[in-house]
Amino acid sequence: MNKQPALAQEQYACVYAWLALLFFREVDDEGLIQLQSAEIADWLALLKRQPALAASVALLEQKIAALSLRQDAQLELAADFCGLFLMTDKKSALPYASQYPQQEPGMIKHLLLEAGMEVNDDFKEPTDHLAIYLELLSHLHFSLGESFQQRRMNKLRQKTLSSLLEWLPEFTNNCFKHDSYGFYAALSQLLLAIVRFDDGKEDLSIVAAE
């Protein structure tokens, strides 16, 4: 049986950047059109070739297809985003590492410093936001294409993945518990599967949709 080749560094980088944007801000009208575009369908088809990602991609594809049947889909997605990621009650899935006891405080700041990165002043969220981890991973995968940095950047990539995996499973579980429509639950499941795949733990079980 032929094994499907792993994703290229540039492909990882682009996927992480895309996911960072979706977890950072609400989907606007333009973003909704992009989600339903042939370009995104092609990207998901590429990811789906990896057996470890296939089930998560299929679930997200179902949720994207269902958007066309959802009245006021953009407004409803915005409400889902707000309820999950911006509220502070027990029915939310806050995207901050500091909200999860498994995570060492300030870890992301150390990782960014090692990577020579700074958070843009326009970024108004706390530094430990999920989107920052994903932007860092995107940067590191692009940097892995430069041979003189490969060893250092790969070591930092592993540290970032390990740090993220300390709390990402609980974040994903919270998304499944509290996202009644399921788009962000499916998105978080795909993210978890990709991070595990990137970390070499693609054989671990993913969160099952209820």
UniProtKB/Swiss-Prot annotation:
Protein name, as recorded: Chaperone protein TorD
High-level lineage: Bacteria, Pseudomonadati, Pseudomonadota, Gammaproteobacteria, Enterobacterales
GO BP annotations, alphabetical order: protein complex oligomerization; protein folding
Keyword Cytoplasm tagged: yes
Sequence similarity: Belongs to the TorD/DmsD family. TorD subfamily.
Reported function: Involved in the biogenesis of TorA. Acts on TorA before the insertion of the molybdenum cofactor and, as a result, probably favors a conformation of the apoenzyme that is competent for acquiring the cofactor.
Entry keyword set: Chaperone, Cytoplasm
Localization per record: Cytoplasm
InterPro entries in alphabetical order: Chaperone_TorD, DMSO/NO3_reduct_chaperone, HscB_C_sf, TorD-like_sf, TorD/DmsD_chaperones
Cited Pfam families: Nitrate_red_del
GO cellular component, one term: cytoplasm
Primary site of residence: cytoplasm
